[in-house]
């Protein structure tokens, strides 16, 4: 099923019983977080708070609170179908030369479809039905959540940030949290390696001292939102990928104050500039680790204009100790990652990011082991192949007789197939999430690889253990008489 905008998605979810309208007045200060957290843990519906206390704009929460709703947002009917999206991305990331004329013809429709999904720029758009400029700009009109008791200020969480580097043809989309610090000021918390920060850095080099235009779209259609958090190849724009998911070209409109292009169907758009050198301390905030992060300095965005639809919806979320929405997104996008990794490493059978590992900090990989040292090659490949795994601290590699998604299996493999000294790989001074306060230096720390595979000659000189396997005939015999035994 495809959705033209956020409202269409909300309507379809409601028809399926996947959205609940909350008509009781609820405060965006702490109360919405508590309600969304309980609902998410119960695998409950998306929530539309129609009467946020002190505001006229309804708040949409827990939108991607189940893997099934993430799959729906990406145009799939089931989570299992996300593997097909992963296969498409794997092909587009590293397309293989055609093996012959027939193979070339078979691949041609894919490239045609990608080309046909180039974004479409329109002259009029719902996101500009209402325009607020200059002294009338007041971010206080938005029901921005204060999620946790120790949060320093309201925090915009689902802002789709649009930037463009001075040396690039294509725009960058990224989701960065933004602390509200005034009527027209927010802090842009983007890490140094992220696309928005790189674009801004290039701008400062090429246009020193000049204000840098930035736009933040709130409440875009689900395909565009999810396209911004998916490992899209550098050769494909997030807007084009969203078009592939949606089955129709992404409609964009030029901002009223810059040449940046934003989703035409977005509910709310913030337009503004970053003045080089204007920085502010951000935080502390409760984040996806379950802890409050330390205070750090980031650029300030001065909002010069707010445009929005008539009767807009404010899309929001919270981050906290898993499970939270980022963890659920990780579970769903895990299925996209598997084919991409398998394209590079065909020996990979499964790949799993346990949600309790804060979405990406731990990975479990099962492989068809083919030679001594194979597990170490795979763990190094995981760390280096996709930028999404740059911050993965622990990689566990097991044989394919282990279920990567069953901790009973994984722990058994670790405790029976590993020698801590021989089978542990430690790498120091590597990039680490700035939110990871356990690292000795902010943004720099170590990684651990655990080789929990059966050891081959060359890896051990001892006779290796032989796993116990039940006798099949006995199992069948007991299956036949089980009900007669009266044990259950």
UniProtKB/Swiss-Prot annotation:
EC class: lyase
Positions annotated to bind prenylated FMN: 175-177, 189-191, 194-195
Residues the record lists as binding Mn(2+): 172, 238
Organism: Pseudomonas syringae pv. syringae (strain B728a)
Cofactor(s) listed in the protein's UniProt record: prenylated FMN; Mn(2+)
Name this polypeptide is given: 3-octaprenyl-4-hydroxybenzoate carboxy-lyase
Residues annotated as catalytic: 287 (proton donor)
Gene name as annotated: ubiD
NCBIfam families, alphabetized: PRK10922.1, UbiD family decarboxylase
Any Gene Ontology CC annotation: cytosol
Cofactor: how bound: Binds 1 prenylated FMN per subunit.
């Amino acid at each position: 099923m495809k959705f033209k905008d956020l409202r269409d998605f909300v309507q379809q979810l409601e028809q399926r019983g996947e959205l609940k309208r909350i008509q009781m007045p609820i405060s965006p200060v702490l109360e919405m977080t508590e309600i969304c957290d309980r609902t998410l843990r119960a695998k409950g519906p998306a929530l539309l708070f129609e009467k946020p206390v002190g505001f006229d704009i309804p708040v949409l929460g827990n939108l991607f609170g189940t893997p099934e709703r993430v799959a729906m947002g990406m145009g799939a009917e089931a989570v299992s179908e996300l593997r097909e999206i992963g296969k498409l991305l794997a092909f587009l990331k590293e397309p293989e030369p055609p093996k012959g004329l027939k193979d070339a013809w078979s691949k041609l429709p894919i490239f045609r479809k990608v080309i046909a999904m180039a974004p479409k720029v329109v002259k009029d758009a719902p996101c500009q039905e209402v325009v607020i400029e200059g002294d009338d700009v007041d971010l206080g009109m938005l029901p921005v959540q204060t999620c946790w008791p120790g949060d320093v200020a309201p925090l915009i969480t689902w802002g789709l940030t649009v930037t463009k580097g001075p040396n690039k043809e294509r725009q960058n989309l990224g989701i960065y949290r933004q602390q509200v610090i005034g009527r027209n000021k927010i802090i842009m918390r983007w890490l140094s390696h992220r696309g928005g920060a790189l674009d801004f850095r290039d701008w400062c080099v090429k246009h020193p001292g000049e204000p840098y235009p930035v736009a933040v779209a709130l409440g875009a259609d689900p395909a565009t939102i999810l396209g911004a958090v998916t490992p899209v190849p550098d050769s494909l724009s997030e807007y084009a990928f969203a078009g592939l998911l949606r089955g129709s070209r992404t409609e964009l409109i030029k901002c009223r104050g810059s040449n940046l292009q934003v989703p035409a169907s977005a509910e709310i758009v913030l337009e503004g500039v970053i003045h080089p050198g204007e920085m502010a301390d951000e935080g502390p905030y409760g984040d996806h680790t379950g802890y409050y992060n330390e205070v750090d300095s980031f650029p300030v965005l001065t909002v010069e204009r707010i445009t929005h639809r008539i009767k807009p919806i404010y899309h929001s979320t919270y981050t906290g100790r898993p499970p939270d929405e980022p963890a659920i997104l990780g579970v769903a996008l895990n299925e996209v990652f598997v084919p991409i990794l398998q394209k590079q490493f065909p020996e990979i059978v499964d790949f799993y990011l346990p949600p309790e590992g804060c979405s990406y900090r731990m990975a479990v990989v099962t492989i068809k082991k083919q030679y001594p040292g194979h597990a170490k090659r795979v763990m190094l490949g995981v760390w280096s192949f996709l930028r999404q795994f740059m911050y993965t601290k622990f990689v566990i590699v097991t044989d394919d007789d282990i279920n990567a998604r069953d901790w009973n299996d994984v722990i058994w493999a670790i405790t029976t197939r590993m020698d801590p000294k021989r089978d542990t790989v430690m790498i120091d001074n590597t990039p680490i999430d700035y939110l990871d306060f356990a690292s000795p230096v902010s943004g720099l720390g170590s990684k651990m690889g655990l080789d929990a595979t059966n050891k081959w000659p060359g890896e051990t000189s001892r006779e290796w253990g032989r796993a116990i396997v039940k006798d099949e005939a006995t199992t069948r015999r007991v299956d036949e008489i089980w009900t007669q035994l009266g044990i259950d």
